[in-house]
């Protein structure tokens, strides 16, 4: 998939960069695999905002995606590549030989008409799902299960993949996209290859309105608010924060505070922690 740029006909097209969607072949989703989904708009069951800057946007239908790949030994043909408004990755529509249809995350390099299969005896080819014990060392995988039978939970976004580093006993060491090296049970399933549509990371919305179409509302800096609205607010002119470091709207430390529990039981499965990003690379802003 290529990147498309625009001439500066308007201020919104000056910096607009989008993907050309040449890989997408289906115009409408499979009716049997879509359901209506109530949009929470960042609210919980009491109507209280728990996630700010959410709301509005275009209407969506949720595509039911098969993250388990549990139809073992039944071959399927790739019928189409569809767009999914709920994620950056595209979806591949599979037609199984027993008549069932399912969506999966479209791996990079997949082709229409290609045959895919899942199971411990599946060939080592892109798009096939196998247990980690049957995948060779050094292979790139995605949609990795954290617990057997629960479905893929890791390496699912566009362009992401994990690498099989080592095998020892009942566990397999995986290098995750965050550079963390973690042990996973050998019976957990993963899909060979990396997730497609990797060029989406090079896109630029170009204008604020396109972000509103995606259901994202404006982010207002705390330093320009009143003191009753944010701990950073108040003062005359462009006043400093007045604290030792930035905090959230609720007074908790922000931008760099570790949030993982020290005594979390799964810490023993983490062989190497992820590389911490700096504030500059993280794109930190005055929350």
From Swiss-Prot:
Under the heading Gene3D superfamilies, the entry gives: 2.30.30.30, Nucleic acid-binding proteins, Ribosomal protein L2, domain 3
Q: Might you name a Gene Ontology BP term for this protein?
A: translation
Q: Where is the composition biased (Basic residues)?
A: 258-287
Question: Where is the stretch described as Disordered?
Answer: 221-287
**Record key words, sorted:** Ribonucleoprotein, Ribosomal protein, RNA-binding, rRNA-binding
User: InterPro entries, alphabetically?
Assistant: NA-bd_OB-fold (IPR012340), Rib_uL2_dom2 (IPR014722), Ribosomal_uL2 (IPR002171), Ribosomal_uL2_bac/org-type (IPR005880), Ribosomal_uL2_C (IPR022669), Ribosomal_uL2_CS (IPR022671), Ribosomal_uL2_dom3 (IPR014726), Ribosomal_uL2_RNA-bd_dom (IPR022666)
Q: Which SMART domains match?
A: Ribosomal_L2, Ribosomal_L2_C
Could you name the Gene Ontology cellular component terms for this entry? large ribosomal subunit
Domain of life, per UniProt, equals Bacteria
Q: Name one Pfam family in it.
A: Ribosomal_L2_C
Molecular function (GO) terms listed? rRNA binding; structural constituent of ribosome; transferase activity
User: Where does the sequence pass through the membrane?
Assistant: none
Q: What does this protein do?
A: One of the primary rRNA binding proteins. Required for association of the 30S and 50S subunits to form the 70S ribosome, for tRNA binding and peptide bond formation. It has been suggested to have peptidyltransferase activity; this is somewhat controversial. Makes several contacts with the 16S rRNA in the 70S ribosome.
Q: How does it assemble?
A: Part of the 50S ribosomal subunit. Forms a bridge to the 30S subunit in the 70S ribosome.
Q: Which family does it belong to?
A: Belongs to the universal ribosomal protein uL2 family.
- What is the name attached to this protein's record? Large ribosomal subunit protein uL2
Which species?
A: Prochlorococcus marinus (strain MIT 9313)
* High-level lineage: Bacteria, Bacillati, Cyanobacteriota, Cyanophyceae, Synechococcales
Name of the coding gene: rplB
């Amino acid at each position: 998939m290529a990147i498309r740029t625009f001439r500066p006909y308007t201020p919104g097209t000056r910096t607009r960069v989008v993907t050309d969607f040449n890989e997408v072949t289906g115009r409408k989703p499979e009716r049997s695999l879509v359901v209506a989904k109530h949009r929470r708009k960042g609210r919980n069951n009491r109507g209280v905002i728990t996630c700010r800057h959410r709301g509005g946007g275009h209407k969506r239908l949720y595509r039911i995606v098969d993250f388990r790949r549990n139809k073992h030994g039944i071959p399927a043909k790739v019928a189409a590549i569809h767009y999914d408004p709920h994620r950056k990755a595209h979806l591949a529509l599979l037609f199984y030989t027993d008549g069932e249809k399912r969506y999966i995350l479209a791996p990079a390099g997949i082709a229409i008409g290609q045959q895919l299969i899942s199971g411990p005896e599946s060939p080592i080819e892109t798009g096939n799902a196998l247990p980690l014990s049957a995948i060779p060392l050094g292979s790139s995988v995605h949609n990795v299960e954290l617990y057997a039978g629960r479905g893929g939970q890791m390496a699912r976004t566009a362009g992401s993949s994990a690498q099989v580093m080592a095998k020892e006993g009942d566990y397999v060491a995986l290098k995750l996209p965050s550079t963390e090296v973690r042990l996973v049970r050998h019976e957990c399933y993963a899909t060979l290859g990396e997730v497609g549509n990797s060029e989406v990371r090079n896109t630029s919305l170009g204008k604020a309105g396109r972000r509103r179409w995606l259901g994202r509302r404006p982010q207002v800096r705390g330093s320009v608010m009143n003191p009753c609205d944010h701990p950073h607010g108040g003062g005359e002119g462009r006043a400093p924060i007045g604290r030792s470091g930035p905090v959230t709207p609720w007074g908790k430390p922000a931008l760099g505070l570790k949030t993982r529990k020290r005594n979390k039981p799964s810490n023993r499965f983490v062989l190497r922690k992820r590389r911490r990003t700096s504030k500059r690379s993280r794109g930190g802003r005055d929350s």
